[in-house]
Amino acid sequence: MKKMNLLVGLFCIAGLSSCQKEKSKPNIIYILMDDMGYGDLQCYGQQKIETPNIDRLRNNGIKLTQHYTGSPVSAPARCVLLTGLHSGHAQIRANDEIASRGAINSHDSMYVHPELEGQYPLKSGTMTIGRMMQNAGYTTGCFGKWGLGYPGSEGVPGKQGFDQFYGYNCQRQAHTYYPPFLWKNDQRVYLDNKIRDPHLTKLDEGADPYDEASYRKFTQNEYANDLIFDEMIHFVDQNKEQPFFLLWTTPLPHVSLQAPERWVNYYVDKFGDEEPYTGNKGYMPCRYPHATYAAMISYFDEQVGKLVDKLKQEGLYENTLIIFTSDNGPTFNGGSDSPWFNSGGLFKSEYGWGKCF
């Protein structure tokens, strides 16, 4: 994390001095993907997945080849990133759950009892990058996945340096992209989706795994990433006259494998037919696992392009610093196939795929 701390320090020195005029402060957008491998982008050697918008950012910017994650799994990696602390000093060091609260793994129970959601919280008064940016005069927003404090705790975004939040509070909820609710600040926003436990929902008994119709129940009405993106663009609209810090913690491309149909169809046409994923390695089944994984990344790349277009439209692009990375490297379950995509890139070894970016 020395590289990360150095970068943040330079940004503070160069852009956040209290003697600067407000208009001269750069907007800062930090994009954090979830379980995306070093080799999943074209600009890092990917041959199958198309990422033209992210590549364009790289071509006009700096490629970081030694920008390492602080931990190989989600919550501690995010804790290290937000606090700048080494994992040995970080408050959160694993994806541990607070089982003493009750039926935390029941999505039906979480729907009724919000106190069963979420993970171990950051402590009150923790110096996070969000709080640091607030102290420097920035309006701060976090959009996507949190996982650093259950609802009502001291670890929620609003108590950790973020003026606005929209997305998933709980990592377990983020294992489906069609959740029954999301969070807007400290309020639940209920969606037009049924409760589908991503770890228990399987193909119906006797269903044909090669028939697309067998998978229809895994696609619902409101795709969380669309809603998160819309709220994020609204945040830019609201704060375009003042410096803002935007932390975009998308849950993509973490499994379950779920993507907009138009992008899945694009890659089915490109890759051809393939063996379905029936759920034998956890998470929800998927008729076209390779096509869907690629679709999730290209869909997000499309969103990055739309965000850049918005910044240019509002005259903000030239005064905005955009940083793009992943919380850790590629996963191995849920139908993902890191070897097929060469997702680990340079970090492949005889012992497996390095979870770093």
Say what each PLM segment does.
Residues K2-L7, F11, C19-F357:
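Formylglycine-dependent sulfatase
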